């Protein structure tokens, strides 16, 4: 089945501590999660490793978020939207359900 949310899509968070925030999808995981730029930041404590050149400390990075908790952002309407699929010229394309425009 084709993915409704893909890498480089702009999404909006629907639930959780970052509700209402927007960001670009950097990774889509096979477990049904996505990593969004600047969303769901967690602090990770790392040990120094001189062999790898890693300095120790507290690093802030993005954690994965469930794909059901984000929706694709429609720039035409300025709101979250749903995605559908249809065939155009023999190719499967994604479109916004609210206005029928193609995604990207």
Curated annotation (Swiss-Prot):
Any one GO molecular function term: rRNA binding
GO biological process: translation
Superkingdom of origin organism: Bacteria
CDD domains, per database record: KOW_RPL26
Gene3D superfamilies: 2.30.30.30
SUPFAM superfamilies on file: Translation proteins SH3-like domain
Keywords: Ribonucleoprotein, Ribosomal protein, RNA-binding, rRNA-binding
Cross-referenced InterPro entries: Rib_uL2_dom2 (IPR014722), Ribosomal_uL24 (IPR003256), Ribosomal_uL24_CS (IPR005825), Ribosomal_uL24_KOW (IPR041988), Translation_prot_SH3-like_sf (IPR008991)
Pfam family, one: ribosomal_L24
GO annotation, cellular component aspect: ribonucleoprotein complex; ribosome
Family under the similarity heading: Belongs to the universal ribosomal protein uL24 family.
PANTHER family, A to Z: MITOCHONDRIAL RIBOSOMAL PROTEIN L24 (PTHR12903)
Function recorded in the entry: One of two assembly initiator proteins, it binds directly to the 5'-end of the 23S rRNA, where it nucleates assembly of the 50S subunit.
The protein's assembly and partners: Part of the 50S ribosomal subunit.
Protein name: Large ribosomal subunit protein uL24
Organism: Shewanella amazonensis (strain ATCC BAA-1098 / SB2B)
């Amino acid at each position: 089945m084709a993915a409704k949310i893909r890498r480089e899509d702009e999404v909006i968070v629907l639930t959780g501590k970052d509700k209402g925030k927007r960001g670009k999808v950097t990774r889509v995981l096979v477990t049904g999660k996505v990593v969004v730029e600047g969303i769901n930041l967690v602090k990770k404590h790392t040990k120094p490793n001189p062999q790898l050149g890693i300095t120790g400390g507290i690093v802030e990075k993005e954690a994965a978020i469930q794909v059901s908790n984000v929706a694709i952002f429609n720039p035409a309407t300025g709101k979250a939207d749903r995605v559908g699929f249809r065939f155009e010229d023999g190719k499967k394309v994604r479109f916004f359900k609210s206005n029928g425009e193609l995604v990207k």
